[in-house]
């Protein structure tokens, strides 16, 4: 964007993950978890916990791969997000934030594979695919990247992107916002 570039006196690039099918980057980690799992680990389905975006991603992915699911949504979840999960045929269970991960552990004992919202190697690798895309896009523009601003919630996004980008641009400053 010329106005932004001129304002900051540098090239500024944006990566809009809101245009992903599930509405956020969260599907990357969920998909990578599924693709990296043994069939036996998925035979009873998946479980996830979230206030919104990860629940949508887990619902989306379980629908694509035709997996049973138990999606724990916080009682405070936005009704719009709840409806998106329902549209992906999610088995939604309401929980409070205090007991949410306890509920997921119970589902794990029933044989459901837990897809963590921001932690675990497969989740971080999924987020890392975003870093690979950014690196390829920057290289295709025959330029480099000195700084990147990445939003921080649970830390999975910045960890995945940062790890990937450091492989291509060791000098990069990774800034959490």
Predicted features along the sequence, with ranges:
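PLP-dependent amino-acid enzyme catalytic core
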Residues: 1-177
